[in-house]
């Protein structure tokens, strides 16, 4: 199956059902005749900007990150930071962003797209982003940017 078709089906499943884990998504895909590995589904989730969010019942589920056509990278970053970042801390010239579980890679991708001059690079895990800035002053400036997005 082609990637575009698989991603279309993933989007359809996530919009129609409350899917909580990658394993559950893989199972749902198999039920409709689509075989995909965990690595493939993980890549699709990242590429499609799928994030984990809290449903009305408080349970965590996958959702398509809202991206209006033509929305700038800065606006996408602002929305993802506001929705996902739960706290941050600075260690000298490194800023650590803590996100909702499963959302760090999406926020990190948007940070990379925006390419702030004070940011040398980012590394993302499941719920943590390490942002390496060029100096302690740049780290403070970056924190101010993020705080302005949240508040």
Swiss-Prot record:
Gene3D superfamilies to which the protein is assigned, alphabetical: 3.30.1360.40, Winged helix-like DNA-binding domain superfamily/Winged helix DNA-binding domain
- Keywords assigned by UniProt? Amino-acid biosynthesis, Arginine biosynthesis, Cytoplasm, DNA-binding, Repressor, Transcription, Transcription regulation
Any GO BP:
L-arginine biosynthetic process
Cellular component per GO? cytoplasm
Please provide, alphabetically and separated by semicolons, the GO molecular function terms listed in this UniProt record.
Answer: arginine binding; DNA binding; DNA-binding transcription factor activity
Name the pathway.
Amino-acid biosynthesis; L-arginine biosynthesis [regulation]
Coiled coil start-end: none
Places the protein is found: Cytoplasm
Q: Which domain of life is it from?
A: Bacteria
Q: Where are the transmembrane segments?
A: none
- Family, similarity comment: Belongs to the ArgR family.
Q: What does this protein do?
A: Regulates arginine biosynthesis genes.
User: Know the name of this protein?
Assistant: Arginine repressor
Q: Which organism is it from?
A: Enterococcus faecalis (strain ATCC 700802 / V583)
What gene name is listed for this protein?
argR
């Amino acid at each position: 199956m082609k990637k575009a078709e698989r991603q279309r089906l993933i989007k359809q499943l996530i919009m129609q059902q409350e899917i909580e884990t990658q394993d559950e998504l893989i199972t749902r895909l198999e039920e409709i005749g689509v075989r995909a590995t965990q690595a493939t589904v993980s890549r699709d989730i990242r590429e499609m900007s799928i994030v984990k969010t809290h449903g009305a019942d408080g349970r965590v589920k996958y959702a398509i990150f809202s991206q209006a056509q033509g929305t700038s990278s800065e606006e996408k970053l602002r929305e993802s930071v506001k929705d996902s970042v739960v706290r941050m801390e600075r260690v000298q010239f490194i800023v650590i962003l803590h996100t909702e579980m499963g959302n760090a890679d999406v926020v990190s991708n948007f940070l990379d797209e925006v390419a702030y001059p004070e940011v040398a690079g980012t590394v993302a895990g499941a719920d943590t982003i390490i942002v390496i800035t060029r100096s302690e002053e740049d780290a403070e400036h970056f924190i101010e940017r993020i705080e302005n997005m949240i508040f």
